[in-house]
Amino acid sequence: MKEKVVLAYSGGLDTTAIIPWLKETFNYDVVCCCIDCGQGEELDGLEERAKLSGAAKLYIEDIVDDFADNYIVPCVQAHAVYEDEYLLGTSMARPAIAKRLVEIARKENAVAICHGATGKGNDQIRFELGITALAPDIKIIAPWRMTDIWTMQSREDEIDYCKAHGIDLPFDAKHSYSRDRNLWHISHEGLELEDPSNEPNYDDLLVMSTTPEKAPDKAEYVTMTFEKGVPKSINGEEMKVSDIIRKLNELGGKHGIGIIDIVENRVVGMKSRGVYETPGGTILYAAHQQLEELILDRATAEVKKEMADKLAQLVYEGKWFTPLREAIQAFVESTQEYVTGEVKFKLYKGTITKAGTTSPYSLYSESLASFTTGDLYDHHDASGFINLFGLPLKVRAMKLQNVEKNQK
């Protein structure tokens, strides 16, 4: 009986070519596993394609709700953003995928897991750190790094290899954008984006969105509710988190929200440029932050921001299954105990504008914030506070004055 390998399978040219290569090189039975994180129509026809390519079995695993509830929500609650712009769409999905690959490998008694990530990107790190953290005994095969036995260097090479092994599928040899899509976002790399001096060709590029210039000329108001930091409804309709994200994607895409063009620092040391569409995610981050502003005290908000930056780095680097990520998430969850309320905002040509926030746990006090005199706040108290708060500055200034006098 042959040993088994679980292949992270997308149905694209790369992973299709890997199937006969694994059989030929290692004499494995190949169990393909396509993890559905919300990529939608990209899954059409996969079963037939995997069978024609020589796979022994195909799993199509729907983890959309797991992805939304256990990976997206913690990052939203933390407000984790990598390098101030990237909302971690691909980064969050990789540990969720790695976890399910390990579960299938255990179920099939597979000796190895194979992925098709290249040797220059971040995904190889994210997949392999996730797999290693959960199953250190399982072998990992990364064909694109095995240049002594993986000899295909272009799409043309892969198409020829497939045809030589009886796989004649309608793959296009011409290069196109490299895309990654899931419930949260879609990323675009390649073609004109490889030169940062080029403006993206948005007419050909965008999939989920329209540009702000082509968005409707009329603003649209949206109301959302949260309970303990978890989104619960849109415009009065309660939904599970994944459906809320889908609805926000529809609304945000319509109004040109969440299109970013960034040059980011990859884990492996090089810079890469990409255009990301994250319409729903951008709205969800903004709505959650809008509510938090009303509820969190200053000290907690300051520390939470520090934790958010660290969490974003951990997620980006593939360190989801680590004690530090768990500790940061536990802290963030504790801050969400009272993040309950309703936010209203309007969407207009790429912008999100606040239009009102309410919460039973609001720390905002109109009587304190106004300029009228109240029972809780005596304006005279500010004098003593300012004297103490500015004492270090006063001591330093007096010291410098004395030094200057002594030097004359």
Locations of regions flagged by a protein language model:
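Nucleotide-activated chemistry modules centered on ATP-dependent adenylation/adenylyltransferase
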Residues: 2-408
